[in-house]
Amino acid sequence: MNNSNVAGLKGNFFTKFAIEQDIAIKDDGTLVKKVTTTINNTFRYDGWLNAVYQNWLRLYVPEGSKLIEKNIEIDLEQKNELGKEVWAAFSRTPPLSSTSSSFTYELPFKVKKGSTYKMLIQKQGGYIPRMIIVVNGKKLFDFDLKKDIELEFKI
């Protein structure tokens, strides 16, 4: 997930981000993932430092992933970039409020029970989001993403 403030001002200083990955593993090994980004604009409107936080977000997923559902404010595009599927959207978060955007998709591969699942999460410069990873309804990880990290867990 890549987030970009496109409105200017100093809104990044007042926003807090959380990114939740909810992974459902079906009996046949199919992986369905819902990725939700929540933006909380914590400061009042003042016309100079903070206003409506306008976010251009892009979700990069493995090539061949199938989009099942999206809950977004403004749909921008779907394309292939850097060997990944990319789904882009736009959201606006007024001062002293929060908004969420989500994408649900099926990954292009399957996993076997008992195997180890590896996930690389790359930190985007400029902010430290809260990362929450849920697998089959159980929260496995909850941390502030301060650097790139590879997570592993048993299926």
Identify the meaning behind each predicted range.
Residues 1-155:
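Lumenal/extracellular ectodomains and adaptor appendage modules
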